[in-house]
């Protein structure tokens, strides 16, 4: 499992709970980042994943963008491709 400072490579799609998709890496290059530099909900959720796993993360606003856009609870489909 990745740790809190691991660099992860993922594909993801993000939605607001009204079904509005606001971002996606699917169909393009995978997204890479350190888990301590993304929203807290990703830091928590992706640490529970194993390589190759796909998971849906329901992230409350206080673990997402905290009033910034997009606001409210967010839903991310995440595929963990690799980590180190």
Question: Where in this protein do the model-derived segments appear?
Answer:
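Cross-family detector of peptidyl-prolyl cis-trans isomerase
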Residues: 1-84
């Amino acid at each position: 499992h990745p740790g809190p400072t691991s660099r992860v490579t993922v594909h993801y799609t993000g939605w607001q709970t009204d079904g509005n998709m606001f971002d996606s890496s699917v169909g393009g290059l995978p997204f890479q980042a350190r888990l301590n530099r993304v929203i807290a909900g990703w830091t928590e959720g992706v640490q529970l994943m194993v390589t190759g796993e796909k998971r849906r993360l329901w992230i409350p606003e206080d673990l997402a963008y905290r009033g910034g856009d997009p606001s409210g609870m967010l839903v991310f489909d995440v595929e963990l491709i690799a980590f180190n």
